[in-house]
Amino acid sequence: MAELSLKKIYSGKVRDLYEIDDKRMLMVASDRLSAFDVILDDPIPHKGEILTQISNFWFKKLAHIMPNHFTGDSVYDVLPKAEADLLKDRAVVVKRLKPIKIESIVRGYLTGSGLKDYQQTGTICGLELPKGLVEAGKLPEPIFTPSSKEEVGDHDINISYAECERLIGKELAAQVRDAAIALYKEAAAYALTKGIIICDTKFEFGLDENGTLTLMDEVLTPDSSRFWSVDTYKEGTNPPSFDKQFVRDWLEQSGWNKQPPAPKVPAEVIEKTVAKYQEALDLLTK
C-alpha cells in the first residue's frame, strides 16, 4: 500500500486507519487476507475495492435502521489528488467513534462454531435451541451470539448474553442485540431475492460523541459473513460459500499448523477466491 500524507493510527488484519482530525479518520481496505487469525503473505488482488463497494452498498441500504460511520466527505476532500486517485475505490472517510468492545454476531443458520456448540450442548452461547436441527439448517429465528473482541492475532471467544451485559452494560447490550438482529433480518430478506443466503454475519458498532449507537467498520461482506448460493444450498451439508473458504480449505489440506508464517497459496486458489468475492458483489448490487 502506498505511503499516505496522513498519519497511520491503526493497522488491522485487513484495514488501516489514518488520522484526519479529532472527529474523522480515513479507513483503507487492503488486499490482505487473514485465515485462522494469521495474515497471509499473498494478497488477493482487488479484494479491498470489492469489500469497500459491498460495504458501501449495505451502509446505504440499511441507513433507515440506524446511523452509520460515514461523514459525507469524499477521499478527495482529505487527500492530495494523486493519493485519492490511488485509493478512491478502497477508502472511506469515517467518524471517529468509541468502539463497543464485543463482536456482534447474528446467526440465521446452523454451521461453524455454532454447530459444534449445538452438537455438544444443544445450545449456542448459552441459548437453548430446539432438538433435531441439522448442519446448515435454518434456525427458527435469527440469534445474537456475541464474542469477545481480542487483539489482532488472538482468537475471539464466544460469550453468553449475560457476559455481554457484564462487559458493556444491560441497556447497551439490549440495544446492540436488537440492532444487529434487525439489520440481519432486513439484509437476509433482500439477499435472498438475489440468490444469496446470509448464513451468519458479524457487525461492529460504536458510540458517537452523543452516545448514539452507530454501525461501523464493514457490513455484510464475504469477510464478515458467510454467504451461500441458493442454488447449492442443502440442509445436512456444508454448502460452499462466497468467501475465503477456498483458501481456508487449501490451507487445511496443506498440513500447515496454523502458526505464522503461512505457506504460499497457489495462484489458482487466489484466482478462484477473487472470482467468488466479485460474484458476491455482482449478485448483491445488480
UniProtKB/Swiss-Prot annotation:
EC number: 6.3.2.6
Entry keyword Cell division: no
GO biological process entries: 'de novo' IMP biosynthetic process
CDD domains the record matches: SAICAR_synt_Sc (cd01414)
Keyword ATP-binding attached: yes
Top-level lineage group: Bacteria
Pathway, per record: Purine metabolism; IMP biosynthesis via de novo pathway; 5-amino-1-(5-phospho-D-ribosyl)imidazole-4-carboxamide from 5-amino-1-(5-phospho-D-ribosyl)imidazole-4-carboxylate: step 1/2
Matching Pfam families: SAICAR_synt
Gene3D superfamilies from the UniProt entry: ATP-grasp fold, B domain, Phosphorylase Kinase, domain 1
One Gene Ontology cellular component: cytoplasm
Catalytic activity as recorded in UniProt: 5-amino-1-(5-phospho-D-ribosyl)imidazole-4-carboxylate + L-aspartate + ATP = (2S)-2-[5-amino-1-(5-phospho-beta-D-ribosyl)imidazole-4-carboxamido]succinate + ADP + phosphate + 2 H(+)
Gene Ontology MF: a single term: phosphoribosylaminoimidazolesuccinocarboxamide synthase activity
Entry keywords, A to Z: ATP-binding, Ligase, Nucleotide-binding, Purine biosynthesis
Record-linked HAMAP family: SAICAR_synth
Family: Belongs to the SAICAR synthetase family.
Name of this protein: Phosphoribosylaminoimidazole-succinocarboxamide synthase
